[in-house]
Structures are given as structure tokens and as C-alpha cells.
Amino acid sequence: FQIFMLKRTSQAAFASGMFVFPGGRVDGDDHLHKYDRYRVGPSQEQAPQVEALGYEWRGFWIAALRETFEEAGLILAYDSAGEMVSLASDKDYTRFQEYREPLHRHKLSLLEICQTENLKLAVDRVHFYNRFVTPVGRPRRFDTRFFIASAPEEQRGRHDEMETVESIWITPQEALKLHEQKEFGLMNVTRIQLEKLALFPDKHSLIAMAENQRHFLIRRPNLPPPE
């Protein structure tokens, strides 16, 4: 199976030139209860994920869906017929791509897109996986929740040409091999996640794990003390 990765611009203040997963910070609007009318899930089977995420679970899930569309152009949502949005037609693809820049510039919200397009966000298809916290002592620290989802078959994704300048579907094994050859820049946390993903033989086993996971890794690595 392949995963979608983005190359950050060399002008970025953080992880410049590195290949990363789609993602970003949680915005205040991501916590709004107004989204409850425009989402499906979390399902009963996802109750352990809700518990692991804590009282801010809504914001984390909405942020994951918003950033996936904003950065990668992948919209994980159901249309008015209850089918996953496909963007198979050029007209639909172009219309949705035109939402991305105003969304990035905070001139448009994901909630407004859902209202305009009559969408319900597919929270039930996006699964909390694990959490990584940057070690104390680093100049920039992050507390990151990682999610796993299967992209709709008809959607291919594309970088935003602002924060990211390249995009690629690639197997975890190939990404790790290219990284070893100094041809595919990765942060340590991304490399570790790829090593975990590479253990799964196919997409179905990976998604099955994500759907049924009951214990969630929280990794807080420590830096060696200064000499």
C-alpha cells in the first residue's frame, strides 16, 4: 500500500524541505459544536479513540479532516446521498480545489464548505493512531496526534503550492529506502511512523488495526542531558 506525503517548502521555518504527512495545528473553530450536524461518527467502535483523545476529541478530529483537505486536497466526507465524495469529474475537482486557498487564509471555514456542499465529515473513517511529544529542550515543541484513514479511490491529492511544493504516493518501504540514500528528507518522528507502517502487509490489515486499537502509544522521548 501507498501513503500520501508532502514536501515542505524550503522557505518553511520548520521542517523545511522535509517530506511529511498532511497535518497542522488545531484552530479554535475546530472545537465548535456546530460541526456536530455535519459529521458522521465517531462510531460506537471508536469509543476507545474518543477516550484516548480526551475532552478535546472533536477539535482533534475536525483539525485532522480540515488539514487533510487544506494541505492535501483530500476531502473525507459523505455527500447528500451518503456516498463518499469522489471528485471524479473535472468540474467537481476544480470546484473543491478552489476552496483550498481561502480555507488556508482563514477566509473560509470547513464548516461553511460542508454547509455549501451539503457534506458530512467522515469522522467514522478517520482513526486516532498515536501521539508524539517533542522532547524538552528543543527550540520548537509539538504535541501531535496522528490519525490513519483510507483515501477515497477516485481522489489523488495534491500539494497546496504554498506550504508544500511536491506530493507523492509512496510505500513506507520505498520512503525509508530513499531516506537511507539521502534522497528523501524525513524528521525522526516521521521516520518512526513509517517504520511502524512498514510492518503491515497491506492496507486492509493497517485499517483493521486502526479500527480495533484499544491501547494508544504516547511517546515522549528524552534528550540526553547537556555535557
Segments predicted by a language model, with ranges:
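N-terminal leader/linker segments that precede catalytic domains of diphosphate-processing enzymes
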Residues: 1-227
